[in-house]
Amino acid sequence: FLITTFVFTALDAGTLKGHVKYDGKAPKPKRLRMDADPVCGSSHSGPVRSENFKMSKDGSMEEALVYLKNVNYSGGVPSEPAVLDQQGCIYVPHVFGMMAGQELLIKNSDATLHNIHSMPKVNKEFNFAMPKVVKKKKASFAKSEPDPFYIKCDVHPWMKTWVLVSDHPYYAVTDASGNFSIENIPPGT
């Protein structure tokens, strides 16, 4: 279920605002078993749950990816990198968007080995280790992808993040209340 508002004049860029809500009984988040790696297990004070469905009691969904398809965009790629961190043996953020050609800065904030393995459909996948002494690596995707795909850690099977690689900047990830805003959408889109 999605409630949206789209406002613009013929001369101005538009803004798409909305709220993403799950319609139905929410799945119960699974408890993650991190005890195989002592660093992962000791990184959290209590049980860690899967982030696959993050939602409030009313069904508002956090970290839902909202994006436009078939948009003509002639602007540039952001100079700032998209950032993906490994914190407490969890990818942060769990869902994100970036543009084709934009740099992806991958961090390892943990004192353990991680393996970063991307699973794109169009771009060449990458698969490299980040031992605890390697704190930063850079990657990128040359082309846009038709759909979001995941990046996983081959060492810790519960670690997965979802990424949209787009040829335009018209995407957003919902906040903790399920709200999103996509700004500067060209007229006629």
Explain the meaning of each model-derived region.
Residues 1-9:
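Bacterial N-terminal signal peptides
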Residues 11-189:
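Extracytoplasmic copper-binding redox domains, predominantly the cupredoxin/blue-copper superfamily
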